[in-house]
Amino acid sequence: MTLREGLPLFHQQFTALFKKNLLLSWRNKRATCLHLFSSFFFILLIFSIEESSKASDLTSTRHKNVTDPKALVSLPILPCEDKFFVRLPCFDFVWSGNQSRRVTDIVSAIMANNPGRPIPTNKVQSFTKPEEVDAWFMSHPSQVTGALHFVEKNATVISYGIQTNSSSEKKRGRREDPTFKFLVPLQIAAEREIARSLIGDPKFSWDFGFKEFARPAIGGEVIISAFYLMGPVFFLAFSMFGFVLQLGSVVTEKELKLREAMTTMGVYESAYWLSWLIWEGILTFVSSLFLVLFGMMFQFEFFLKNSFVLVFLLFFLFQFNMIGLAFALSSIISKSSSATTVGFLVFLVGFITQIVTTAGFPYSSAYSIGSRVIWSLFPPNTFSAGLQLLLEATSSPGDSGISWSERAICAGGESTCVITTNKIYIWLVGTFFFWFVLALYFDNIIPNASGVRKSIFYFLKPSYWTGKEGNKVEEGSICSCIGSVPPVEHITPEDEDVLEEEILVKQQAMDGRVDPNIAVQIHGLAKTYPGTTKLGCCKCTKTSPFHAVKGLWMNIAKDQLFCLLGPNGAGKTTTISCLTGINPVTGGDAKIYGNSIRSSVGMSNIRKMIGVCPQFDILWDALSSEEHLHLFASIKGLPPSSIKSIAEKLLVDVKLTGSAKIRAGSYSGGMKRRLSVAIALIGDPKLVFLDEPTTGMDPITRRHVWDIIQESKKGRAIILTTHSMEEADILSDRIGIMAKGRLRCIGTSIRLKSRFGTGFVATVSFIENKKDGAPEPLKRFFKERLKVEPTEENKAFMTFVIPHDKEQLLKGFFAELQDRESEFGIADIQLGLATLEEVFLNIARRAELESATVEGTMVTLELESGIAVEIPVGARFVGIPGTENAENPRGLMVEVYWQQDGSGSMCISGHSAEMRIPENVSVIYEPSSQVLGHGQRRVRGIVIDYESNN
């Protein structure tokens, strides 16, 4: 199959990535709607605040021209409940002078003739003297609006006084005026009823009114509205929604290693960034358009009087600027959960700088050009300056705003003007390119999810542009105190097969000979991580480097499956990461179909011919399996006409046809692994990496996937890693076992079992009705002939492990055993090699022991005698200090049984009974101090080389 290249591939990748972004946005409807339509709620909020402000000022004439003020007449005494913050029970008024019958009648008339409502008797309190009223005030604060004090001096003279609280209260933005609300109504009522009493006419008309002076509007014609006060802050907050969503989307793909998976498939960086830029640009365009339309819909003069294009461009260019800033920050942020926090910080800084910009800094002739340049690099600053210009152009009722033709003209023709609307737009365009280029630069020099980065001067190196060698590893922090990564010391392999493989590869490399049957040739591959770096006070400190892979030499043939085994931390996944280009190598090289992994051109060719099923599923939860396959097939460069049929075939192969349109987020773990296997097989790759492909699958599905892998061997090489020894035994043509970064053994399954297994495994099954105790003669037969005891026995069968050195005796032994089947009651005899699991544990255990004796990694073995023995991890035969006596001059030892725990680490599963240490065995490891604690109940064990001597 011919894959697309160059511009056609770029176009195909861009289209697929753009469609992916569209689907993700469509399926995350809540976030997308928030991005597009949040402007409506901000505009509505501003409108509501402004209308509320206008409603509270309806009775105010402060901002109006008053030419013919109307008089206020017949003001009633208000209920006491109308007073702000009154205490209940309350009174409409209190009065003094109740010793006078005439005064009492006047007060009764005030209550009865109150305009609009008579005052109930229980809402009025009477006293004799003003002093009594004062005392009552002190004991009943805030329970009355005012007091009247009457004195009848003679038949024609009645004097009165009014007492009110002059303190002005404020409630819900409105201030209470005690003079006009309480004092004036009491004064009118008192004078009216006193006049009627003196005249003797209870119907006497008493008209009294007051009005303000005719005057112009206070403060000129400048209107200070909620829009002009709060609009800039709300517009900045509105822009943060899109900014946070853009930042979170890009960081999520980096955090989940989705971008890394696409890179492995050969995605162009240019197609990746352009797809994000165009899609986010479209969303920004639509959201900016809606903002302006909503502003016009609510009849804000800012949107109506200024040029539509000018207002739209300001919001669009600002939000487009924020896309560039989001891309730049995405290189620094490693967690998508941090996007909201970063968005809030950017808003907070933008809010502060907005206040400073509104105050005039630095866009005036009083400040230098340099300060304006630096200040304008932060998008919210130029946005605030542009908003200020457009707001000032519509701040007064007579202002006509700024038209398109006036965009380059200073407002009012000021000689001190240094910024115009046109310059604002030029700045916004320029700063977008600044942030976008910075984003691309940061993306290359800041460590990615795998800790890989380029040199800070990578763009100056010819190798970056030519793609030829010259590849220097750059990893970890940018801190300059990181030195060069130390080279891996070459260690001659102890295993004869590994040494033979290394010699063969070196000889082929030296001769320049390319074997057409070899798919992958690894030349001394090494990978070292420089360790973590911490910045302290005026210094950098770092931990020791970690050698993950220590000089790997081997060939991987075509049409074969090579299984790479090893415990956790052995270097398997790191090796695959180096071969797929995810991690750069520290030393050595590898040739995949003749292409070097150290060359960017070679790596580009390699990615066209490989497929990768990573250790952990790297999938979009919102995309279906069908959409995943279409996306990766397009990235790979498959012809568009073949993508649908290939995707359908792969779905059939992995049994996902019925779930093809279901989103991957709803899949089980096994279904996700099957989808990852299908993605790895897209485009008929010549080399497939399967990193634990059947993890989480049920047995039936696992068997089906094994069939797929077996069928996929033809015409390609497959590199498999797994923790299932059964899977490795069934699928692999060759097996390599790694431990502690080094290849410990290599060969076919039978070869490894014969070399590293404990020997042959014989299983003897008995006839069902065989009586109890009959197996004893059989046990004696094995003991006498082969010197072995059963490792497992019950009524149904016995299992014996026969050492390799007894191989010459087996033919005659089993011939005699078959002749005596009826004597021993034998139903069946099975003979086989040790399991691959046993081989793996032996190799892993030896590697752990090798490392533990150097690093001092210990575990505690609890013996039945109560002694606790500290032993190195991986030790098999352990001598117990303090058990020496005349009968056992070298003491006692136990055999320790090891297994892997759930995390893949070696742990103790049990131990044998204590046995005598033979005289002829040597010691592998002996601690300097053997006794720990009191009473010799805790000791350090001695590692015995019983295997070699036995």
From Swiss-Prot:
It is found in: Endoplasmic reticulum membrane. SMART domains: AAA. Overexpression of ABCA9 increases seed oil content. Its main location: endoplasmic reticulum. InterPro entries: AAA+_ATPase, ABC2_TM, ABC_transporter-like_ATP-bd, ABC_transporter-like_CS, ABCA, ABCA2/9/11_C, P-loop_NTPase. It comes from the Eukaryota. The chain crosses the membrane at residues 31-51, 223-243, 276-296, 308-328, 342-362, 426-446. Pfam families: ABC2_membrane_3 (PF12698), ABC_tran (PF00005), ABCA11_C (PF25158). Highly expressed in siliques. Detected in seedlings, rosette leaves, stems and flowers. Residues 520-765 form the ABC transporter domain. One of its GO terms (biological process) is seed development. It is a multi-pass membrane protein. One of its GO terms (cellular component) is endoplasmic reticulum. Belongs to the ABC transporter superfamily. ABCA family. CPR flippase (TC 3.A.1.211) subfamily. Mediates the transport of acyl-CoAs and/or free fatty acids to the endoplasmic reticulum. Has no effect on the selectivity of fatty acid incorporation into triacylglycerol or further desaturation steps. This is ABC transporter A family member 9. It comes from Arabidopsis thaliana. The lineage of its organism: Eukaryota, Viridiplantae, Streptophyta, Embryophyta, Tracheophyta. The gene is ABCA9.
